[in-house]
A protein has these predicted regions:
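N-terminal signal peptide c-region/cleavage motif recognized by signal peptidases
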Residues: 17-19
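Short, surface-exposed alpha-helix to beta-strand junction/turn motifs within ectodomains of secreted
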Residues: 47, 51-71
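Cleavable N-terminal signal peptides
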Residues: 10-12, 21-22
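Extended, polar beta-sheet/loop recognition surfaces of beta-rich domains
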Residues: 31, 37-41, 45-52, 107-121
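Cleaved targeting-peptide boundary
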Residues: 23-31
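A glycine-anchored, Pro-Gly-centered beta-turn/N-cap motif
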Residues: 87, 92-98
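Bacterial N-terminal signal peptides that target proteins for export
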Residues: 1-11
Length: 121
């Protein structure tokens, strides 16, 4: 029994303390605009920041209005390997939803939504 515990304890420790990046999915940690925010401009700069590297060429960001109609986005380059950026121009006042889907460097897909309202004067 002692021999069994002698080699399984270090093995379990290696498994449990393994590289967090190996098990990490790309989770959204910050967005601009943040969820349920009111934006006071007809131009909205979108930044989605994740907790790990993403495969930007295999990610999607879509914007829809309150009726679910797609709204054009201009994707922009980000220097950070964990961030997506886009700009929406000429938004009318109303509710909008950002729909994102990313492929993490670990090969897992995560997706989510961020809602915001435009109330510009």
């Amino acid at each position: 029994m002692t021999r069994f515990l002698g080699w399984t304890a270090p093995l379990a420790l290696v498994f449990l303390a393994g590289s967090p990046a190996a098990f990490a999915h790309a989770m959204l940690v910050r967005s601009s605009p943040s969820d349920q925010t009111v934006v006071r401009s007809h131009q909205v700069n979108i930044a989605l920041d994740y907790d790990s590297r993403i495969e930007t060429s295999r990610c999607t960001v879509k914007l829809t209005d309150a009726a679910g109609k797609p709204v054009p986005l201009q994707m922009e380059h980000s220097a950070k390997p964990s961030e997506l950026n886009a700009v929406a121009h000429g938004l009318a006042n109303g509710k909008y939803q950002i729909h994102w889907q990313v492929l993490a460097s670990d090969g897992h897909i995560t997706r989510g939504d961020v809602a915001f309202t435009v109330a510009a004067q």
